[in-house]
């Protein structure tokens, strides 16, 4: 009888094993992931963008990325800023099984790597599903997620991973994941493989030659706030970047004010102030992204608690909104794109030069005269220029008289010749064109493509 006992146990295990396999939680998780990726095909799009005259931080050329429908009735697609471009561009969106549809930029965020595109829903030939968005909180560390998009042109492809951290090390707060995010994934959804909800917008990954499995996504609560304000017809712009904050020993940005360049009449922040909380409604502030998020749509009436000289004080006032990216204008002169200087440069140089060279076209007259990106424009034909309108007036005068235009530039120098150096250049005027919309578009419409000819307003977008 003893010899039969092992046999009976073996038979019992054989009979039980199939039942265990059928109820294995891993199988349920696998199925949930498969369903999430299959569902994502219904509301994820491929985006193609072409840029001819880029502002700084953009590039010339054609690019592709991903996006997802966030309002099927209006034809709104959420994606990355670097996919939609901060420059005037040609954009198309393509659904799974469909052809390319023209799209326009509705909103481009100056703080987060986010943008909203708009296409004509009647031209799509379908009413796409909308994804479920996790707008309340980011998932915990270790949560299974999937990145969906078009990596290296492999369309509508999913990859798996987990959430690794929430980090502000790169500036804006980001959701860190080891799910592979490659070229073509940018702007696509990062999906919870447990709930099927979108938890982030795929944005970037660390260089593969230096690290493995470190990618980043914009947390969904920040993206939801922008979309919700747009749906209400309100401006979701964050506060203008006129306050410089200190960085701590861990290279993490803090909420300690290093310098305030807010105008007179705005909220009275001073060097050394530590921002603690937003009041009305009460909300503790943890980092700069938290501050930007909390102030969207509330910039006209800001109440902050700050620690000043060891005591907590309450400040009240307004905070100017960041300039709307889609309203930005530039002046194309002989192969150089000149526009307002970037916020990180504006106010850092004595005299605060307001105009900067954003792009120099290869082979152009501007390149031949050694104009360079980030050159600050001080004078034209010996006269100060403090706006695009004044620069355009002087350029038109030179063009009419068929004479060259002389420029005084301020350029980053070196140890040998000083931090900044002054350069003079004489530029033949091959062509003078306005880049951007002649007037500010409504929030429901996107910026126009490159426009030639109209006069610039005295208050160009920046």
Language-model features and meaning:
Residues 28-34, 54-74, 99-102, 187, ...:
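A conserved glycine-rich beta-strand in the N-terminal activation segment of trypsin-fold
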Residues 37, 193, 197-238, 417, ...:
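C-terminal subregion of chymotrypsin/trypsin-like serine protease catalytic domains
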Residues 105, 118, 231, 235-462:
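C-terminal recognition in membrane/secretory proteostasis and scaffolding
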Residues 44-46, 77-80, 138-151, 189-209, ...:
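Active-site-proximal beta-strands of protease catalytic cores
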Residues 21-68, 80, 226-248, 461:
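N-terminal activation segment of mature serine protease catalytic domains
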Residues 32, 126-173, 207-214, 226-234, ...:
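Flexible, gly/ser-rich surface segments that form the specificity/activation loops bordering the active-site cleft
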